[in-house]
Amino acid sequence: MEKEQETLRAWKDRVARELDRVVAFWLDHSHDQEQGGFFTCLGRDGQVYDDLKYVWLQGRQVWMYCRLYRQFERFRRPELLNAAKAGGEFLLRYAQVAPPAKKCAFVLTRDGRPVKVQRTIFSECFYTMAMNELWRVTGDARYQNEAMEMMDQIVSWVREDPSGLGRPQLPGAPASESMAVPMMLLNLVEQLGEADEELAGISAELGDWCAQRILQHVQRGGQAVLENVSEDGEELSGCLGRHQNPGHALEAGWFLLRYAIQRGDAKLRAHVIDKFLLLPFHSGWDPEHGGLFYFQDADGLCPTQLEWAMKLWWPHSEAMIAFLMGYSETGDPALLRIFYQVAEYTFHRFRDPEYGEWFGYLNRDGKVALTIKGGPFKGCFHVPRCLAMCEEMLNNLLSRLAPASALSTRSPPAGPTRPGAE
């Protein structure tokens, strides 16, 4: 037991230090002091290589700053809150392409002019998360009103009439459902219902619907999690149907774990650990080089995506969350061993000790393929969310294992630290 505490404490300290370094990187390099919002196209050293602004990443960074400000005393600092508010105001002014219509741009120019619109719900989802978190830290009702109005629109698009997304219904296209849509909605249900029993009650049916839609992606007699299924929960033909994304399954796993825990459903919790944690990990871990494959084919055929064998930052971040959460809830040492396995690989391969933050894209053998720290798809989100959640879970585990007096002698880092020695 003492050795276990020492290992957990060492990882807690390591994760906390890394969170400080990651936050410092974004504080130093991403803020647009002139136009508002954030730069996310950042090179290895934080230099801006493109000033386009991606709405979903703007929303993610606002959410992340607010969450850190709200949940960690050492991040309760004016510079984080002010940057989050500036990012939120940038979104309020520019995210929606043609107000009062709710559709948000995917890409904006630096000064907020729309460049591209995606026919999906994801910019709108992260807009909603940002507004709700801003309301929680500021008390400004404008933000919550925006969040609730956008949530209503998203639910309408998903469950009633998708025509507002602008996707044509082509006769040859299969009626498919990506796991990403119910995952994202379940995340929003939890976000909006936090500490609000009335709203949580109203949205309970939506949460149940989302969970059931995610669970139907377990196919082939429980032997595979497929990224796409038909609208009635059946396997699709061809590459689309065989497509697997281990990192996405693991992220869905911890979303479902929290759902099961909130409902006190031990049977569902066990099912989720088996099918959404252990199954995608064991099938998705590269036995030769380590790390999680980005994409797989359920029949073992060669995936068509050029990046299928690469190792990306976010699946490993989500795996760390999933397995530490699974261990926290069950005490199963096998889950803790996998957390350590993933965390060691992740810290060794993705972490940049010289400039801070993590590399996002590795070749199959674990060597850095792209030196950028941010871009159209990587911003201030998966890495700090992973580190923040893992720090909290490790603290809670140590509190359960050790006397409070022993923990009180160890304080977390004083604040964000700049790149240097770990």
UniProtKB/Swiss-Prot annotation:
One of its GO terms (biological process) is N-acetylneuraminate catabolic process. It catalyses: an N-acyl-D-glucosamine = an N-acyl-D-mannosamine. SUPFAM superfamilies: Six-hairpin glycosidases (SSF48208). One of its GO terms (molecular function) is N-acylglucosamine 2-epimerase activity. The record marks 380 as: Important for enzyme activity. Its EC number is 5.1.3.8. Pathway: Amino-sugar metabolism; N-acetylneuraminate degradation. Keywords: Isomerase. It is an enzyme of class 5 (isomerase). Belongs to the N-acylglucosamine 2-epimerase family. Homodimer. Forms a heterodimer with renin and inhibits its activity. Catalyzes the interconversion of N-acetylglucosamine to N-acetylmannosamine. Involved in the N-glycolylneuraminic acid (Neu5Gc) degradation pathway. This is N-acylglucosamine 2-epimerase. It comes from Bos taurus.
